[in-house]
């Protein structure tokens, strides 16, 4: 592999630079591949300079001049580039190799590498013998690689142009006398015997065909590759700008087409409406024939009734004319009946436009909008608009209520403090008790939410629930707990959600929060009876205390059933059965005995045998 690159001395981990050479970019953890095989030069540092690419390790340094490079491109290996490091393929005249970037930063290195190839110096150090050996080495690796991001350096001519130069040098260096002098005396005789007069003609035709092919290939090459000078530095940016402009033009054209289509649709709708109006007017004209025709068969419209009424009012208000004026008028009247100048038909067909702007049943064209399918659609649209207005107004009111909810909770806390101070001095009235219960229902000032607590939501919810149950005395004040400090999970869910107001929680969140009571060392615990009833009770509550309370009830009221216990303690029937029979029951403790009748009734008595 050392023959591929030019050896470079390494001093303290840095390569020895050439004159007027400077380092542009460095990338660590880079390996060199010879085709698909990984070489011994791995996990080194690649340095990009103004004249060459240098691979450096602790002991050795390898450099490759920019003048020898024909092509560089990004290479993707594996399935969609998954499971392999990004690579760069560097192609020379008769050989190629790869640089594998294990730590990334391949694209930045490739971008700067291309810029350095465009800006490489015109005079660079001549390659050593090792590089000439590398150029003459054959390329035995036929690699299939991706040509998506290929880059052809415009300063180096293609391979076919180099072959042409080599052939021309061979033709120019041809000397027939030199061959004759080196030949033996027997060779001229053999040449004369093997002389073919058509051979020179065939060679000329072959040369002409080669020249034509070369001209065709040069025409296919872009102009910037035929020129010796590199493309301008802003060439690629200019191409990108052109592409962006083309995309913008296409988008504008699409928008214009959409606007034109919308205009055409609107025009078609207007035409359809006009046709419907004309048909409606024709139907009205056919149904109402002309009421009065003149003697000369000239149909002229009559004045509207409002005009006639206006004229009559003016005549009544004006003073009566003089007799002379009446005589002249009576003399001037013709013997024939007056010829009407108007036709009532046109007056009937004219639309009656109401002055009331809220009248939505009539259109400007004189026919009702509720007629036909169009009228039904208009009514449906009106209803949807009204519903949208109602919803928007109601939601705006809800948003205002949600904003004011926190202020109401803080106010309730202040009032509660004042009431507690008052109860310390004097007795409370019924109104104060009702007001205190109302403040209890107002609930929590700043409830825990998933937005505020995030990953610690259930922990903080469990702590807040425990503090709220203890401070509000929920276990003692709840009617369903009786004398026992115990409440079912369903009742707790209803009370706690009512206290939270708007920020409601799900049953699953409440259950998870209750499960964390013991792990967070809180004074409550969650308990599940064999019947499936789940309750929240005090951590200090035990079975013996429950049994003692049941014994006291039996001593006062006599033998009782599960129904009687549920009625006395105001608890559910299932919870009463669980207290008597399952888990924490007094029967298992041996302090009660039961009497089962044939009818199925079960009564619990004090166990006199133990006493």
From Swiss-Prot:
This is Vacuolar protein-sorting-associated protein 36. Residues 119-193, 213-243, 280-346 are annotated as: Disordered. Component of the ESCRT-II complex, which is required for multivesicular body (MVB) formation and sorting of endosomal cargo proteins into MVBs. The MVB pathway mediates delivery of transmembrane proteins into the lumen of the lysosome for degradation. Component of the endosomal sorting required for transport complex II (ESCRT-II). Belongs to the VPS36 family. Its main location: cytoplasm. Residues 121-193, 213-228, 307-334 have a biased composition (Low complexity). Residues 288-300 have a biased composition (Polar residues). It is found in: Cytoplasm; Endosome membrane. It comes from the Eukaryota. It comes from Dictyostelium discoideum (Social amoeba). One of its GO terms (molecular function) is ubiquitin binding. Keywords: Coiled coil, Cytoplasm, Endosome, Membrane, Protein transport, Repeat, Transport. Residues 204-288 form a coiled coil. It is a peripheral membrane protein.
């Amino acid at each position: 592999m050392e023959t591929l690159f030019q050896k470079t001395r390494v001093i303290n981990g840095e390569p020895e630079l050439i004159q007027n050479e400077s380092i542009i970019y460095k990338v660590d953890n880079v390996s060199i591949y010879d085709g698909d095989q990984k070489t011994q030069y791995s996990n080194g540092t690649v340095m990009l300079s103004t004249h060459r690419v240098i691979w450096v390790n602790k002991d050795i340094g390898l450099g490759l001049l920019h003048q020898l490079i024909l092509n560089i491109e990004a290479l993707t290996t594996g399935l969609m580039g998954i499971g392999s490091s990004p690579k760069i393929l560097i192609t020379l005249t008769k050989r190629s190799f790869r640089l594998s970037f294990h730590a990334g930063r391949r694209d930045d290195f490739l971008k700067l590498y291309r810029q350095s190839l465009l800006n490489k110096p015109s005079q660079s150090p001549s390659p050593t013998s090792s590089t000439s050996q590398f150029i003459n080495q054959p390329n035995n690796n036929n690699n299939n690689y991706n040509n998506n991001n290929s880059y052809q350096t415009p300063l180096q001519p293609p391979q076919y142009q180099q072959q042409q130069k080599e052939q021309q040098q061979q033709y120019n260096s041809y000397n027939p006398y030199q061959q004759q002098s080196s030949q033996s005396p027997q060779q001229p005789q053999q040449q004369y015997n093997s002389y073919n007069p058509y051979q020179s003609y065939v060679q000329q035709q072959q040369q002409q065909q080669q020249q034509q092919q070369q001209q065709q290939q040069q025409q296919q090459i872009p102009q910037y590759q035929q020129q010796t000078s590199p493309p301008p530095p802003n060439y690629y940016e200019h191409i990108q700008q052109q592409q962006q402009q083309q995309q913008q033009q296409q988008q504008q054209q699409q928008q214009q087409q959409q606007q034109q289509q919308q205009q055409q649709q609107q025009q078609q709708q207007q035409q359809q409406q006009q046709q419907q109006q004309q048909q409606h007017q024709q139907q009205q004209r056919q149904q109402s024939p002309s009421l009065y025709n003149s003697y000369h068969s000239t149909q002229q419209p009559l004045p509207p009734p409002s005009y006639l009424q206006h004229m009559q009012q003016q005549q009544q208000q004006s003073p009566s004319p003089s007799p002379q004026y009446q005589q002249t008028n009576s003399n001037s009247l013709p013997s024939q009946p007056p010829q009407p100048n108007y036709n009532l038909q046109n007056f009937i067909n004219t639309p009656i436009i109401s002055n009331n702007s809220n009248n939505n049943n009539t259109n400007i064209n004189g026919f009702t909008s509720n007629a036909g399918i169009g009228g039904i659609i208009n009514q449906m649209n009106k209803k949807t608009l009204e519903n949208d207005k109602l919803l928007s107004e109601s939601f705006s009111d809800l948003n205002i209520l949600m904003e004011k909810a926190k202020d109401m909770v803080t106010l309730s806390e202040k009032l509660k403090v004042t009431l507690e101070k008052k109860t310390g001095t004097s007795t409370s009235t019924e109104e104060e008790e009702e007001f205190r219960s109302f403040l209890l229902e107002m609930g929590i000032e700043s409830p825990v939410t998933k937005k505020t607590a995030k990953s610690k939501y259930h922990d903080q919810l469990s702590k807040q629930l425990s503090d709220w149950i203890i401070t509000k005395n929920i276990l003692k004040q709840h009617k369903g707990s009786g004398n026992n400090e115990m409440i079912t999970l369903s009742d707790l869910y209803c009370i706690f959600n009512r206290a939270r107001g708007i920020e409601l929680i799900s049953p699953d969140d409440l259950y998870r929060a209750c499960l964390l009571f013991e792990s967070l060392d809180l004074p409550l615990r969650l308990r599940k009876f064999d019947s499936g009833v789940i309750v929240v009770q005090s951590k200090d509550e035990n079975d013996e205390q429950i049994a003692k309370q049941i014994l006291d009830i039996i001593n006062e009221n006599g033998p009782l059933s599960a129904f009687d216990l549920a009625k006395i303690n105001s608890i559910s029937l299932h919870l009463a059965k669980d207290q008597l029979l399952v888990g924490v029951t007094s029967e298992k403790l041996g302090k009660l005995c039961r009497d089962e009748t044939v009818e199925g009734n079960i009564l619990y008595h004090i166990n006199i045998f133990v006493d």
